[in-house]
């Protein structure tokens, strides 16, 4: 178990209250101590089972409780998923994330999920899944199949959480993260900005994440995507500086974690995204829809990477796979790039 300093709420609040430019400077300094600031890790996310979720998360179009026009789909066939993973690899992603709209997976689904993980790993990609609550046996089985990362977000602070979700407790989420960690799988966990939370709630979320026995290796920070039909469709927009500030504080508090720009990037300007990279974000979802929300078209990402001089990160599992690295670099920096993968069309 890792030993790291525990943060206090007053320390986190102090960070959020820092003058913006001072905060950015501190975050960038810490970022450079642990990462190459020119490198960004690239992931692709595929919804392997969409809609009809029994949970009541007020932000989510996948909930069966809200009329969002989202058509429910059954669990995809293994070969369909692996075909999508091949396309993702050819487009340059180094991690393939598979998400299912469940409260928890059923044991009958586990053999298919294990085959998906094994197939993705055989391609030389990192494998990540987000399937809801796991029990010990399921976590161990996914670990044995080779799963690298498991995503299970805390979403917000413990104090605000009950305003967003009532069908799953905060402790259930923490318990799943513990089971995943004990099974030897890396943890991916973050939250959402724009749920109607206060700055103290954002501080409380990051406090929970940073004070886990081992902080998450990957911390996705989402900006709420307002979907018609959900209770949060009319929420106020998030101020760009408030979002960037959250990224910066996450970077300072979890200096060795990958901080990922996730949902909501489509509604961010290039300037906002650039400031997020300055604040310490060093991972993105590339070229697909984030489960059911739009993500910027790949060519826009290519252009932004080129403008900022950013390069895709080579992950540990792909060390020595120069062909893979060159493919993505060619797509990112050649003006006449061809078609890119979009999971939504599969």
From Swiss-Prot:
Homodimer. The lineage of its organism: Bacteria, Pseudomonadati, Pseudomonadota, Gammaproteobacteria, Enterobacterales. Pfam families: BATS, Radical_SAM. Its cofactor is [4Fe-4S] cluster; [2Fe-2S] cluster. NCBIfam families: bioB. Its EC number is 2.8.1.6. CDD domains: Radical_SAM. [2Fe-2S] cluster binds at residues 97, 128, 188, 260. This is Biotin synthase. Disulfide bonds: none annotated. It comes from Enterobacter sp. (strain 638). Catalyzes the conversion of dethiobiotin (DTB) to biotin by the insertion of a sulfur atom into dethiobiotin via a radical-based mechanism. The keyword Ribosomal protein does not apply. It catalyses: (4R,5S)-dethiobiotin + (sulfur carrier)-SH + 2 reduced [2Fe-2S]-[ferredoxin] + 2 S-adenosyl-L-methionine = (sulfur carrier)-H + biotin + 2 5'-deoxyadenosine + 2 L-methionine + 2 oxidized [2Fe-2S]-[ferredoxin].
């Amino acid at each position: 178990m890792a030993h790291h300093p525990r943060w206090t709420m007053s320390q986190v609040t102090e960070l959020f209250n820092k003058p913006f430019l001072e905060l950015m400077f501190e975050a960038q300094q810490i970022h450079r101590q642990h990462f190459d600031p020119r490198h960004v890790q690239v992931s692709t996310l595929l919804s392997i089972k969409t809609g009809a979720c029994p949970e009541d998360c007020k932000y989510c179009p996948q909930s069966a409780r809200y009329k969002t026009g989202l058509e429910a789909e059954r669990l995809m066939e293994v070969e369909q998923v692996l075909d999508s993973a091949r396309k993702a690899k050819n487009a340059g992603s180094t991690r393939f994330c598979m998400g299912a709209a469940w409260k928890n997976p059923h044991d009958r689904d586990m053999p298919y999920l294990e085959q998906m993980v094994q197939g993705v790993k055989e391609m030389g990609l990192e494998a990540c899944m987000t399937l809801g609550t796991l029990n010990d046996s399921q976590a161990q089985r996914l670990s044995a199949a080779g799963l690298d990362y498991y995503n299970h977000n805390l979403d917000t602070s413990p104090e605000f959480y009950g305003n967003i979700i009532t069908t799953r407790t905060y402790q259930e989420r923490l318990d799943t993260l513990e089971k995943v960690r004990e099974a030897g799988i890396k943890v991916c966990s973050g939250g959402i900005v724009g749920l109607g939370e206060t700055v103290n709630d954002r501080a409380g979320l990051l406090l929970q994440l940073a004070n886990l026995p081992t902080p998450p290796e990957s911390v996705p920070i989402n900006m709420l995507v307002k979907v018609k039909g959900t209770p949060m469709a009319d929420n106020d927009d998030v101020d760009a500086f408030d979002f960037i500030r959250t990224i910066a504080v996450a970077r300072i508090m979890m200096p060795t974690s990958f901080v990922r720009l996730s949902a909501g990037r489509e509604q961010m300007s290039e300037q906002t995204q650039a400031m997020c990279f300055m604040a310490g974000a060093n991972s993105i979802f590339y070229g697909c829809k984030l489960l059911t929300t739009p993500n910027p078209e790949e060519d826009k990402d290519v252009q932004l990477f080129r403008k900022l001089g950013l390069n895709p990160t080579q992950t540990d599992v792909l060390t020595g796979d120069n062909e893979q690295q060159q493919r993505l670099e060619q797509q990112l920096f050649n003006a006449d790039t061809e078609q890119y993968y979009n999971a939504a069309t599969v």
